[in-house]
Amino acid sequence: MSNTEITAKTQADEAHSFAEYEAIATALLPYIDAAKTGDGELSRTAFYDHAHIVGSVGGEFSYPDADAFAENVSQIGASPDVKSRIAWIDISGPAAAAKVEFINWSGLRFTDFFVLYKTDGQWKISGKVYDSHSNN
């Protein structure tokens, strides 16, 4: 076997790895889509019930639970011009971390860091730390 050949095990491992990245990106979509639509209930589906959320908007520290955060998303309403990107995803077994950036979510720029965990074959957000930056 030459050094350039990929073994069947490596192919299977890499296919699984790619699938996990896609599954995590999919798990983040309800949250990302809620920024655009203002649908707090959609955002809520991305979080475990026990999820911890901490961060700041305009320098004001906040630590809402997942239900209160969903209410905030609904109150803010739709931001149809929001832009977002998943900057990175890092996975270790059933645990993962992700960074998502938003521009123009209700006129603000946000950086969100997520901790996700996979149970029963499903990835969900267990924790979120965020910060708003200066207006776009």
In which residue ranges do the predicted regions lie?
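Short, low-complexity N-terminal intrinsically disordered segments enriched in polar/charged residues
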Residues: 1-41, 45-49, 62-64
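Short beta-strand edge/turn micro-motifs at domain boundaries
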Residues: 2-5, 109-136
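Surface-exposed, charged secondary-structure patches
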Residues: 19-23, 52-109
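Hydrophobic residues in well-ordered beta-strands that form the structural core
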Residues: 43-44, 55, 127
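Short beta-strand segments enriched in hydrophobic/aromatic residues
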Residues: 47, 102-104, 129-130
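Sparse recognition of residues in long alpha-helices and their boundaries
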Residues: 47, 59-60, 114, 132
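Beta-strand-connecting loop/turn residues
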Residues: 49, 94, 121-122
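Short secondary-structure capping/turn micro-motifs that flank functional sites
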Residues: 51-52, 134
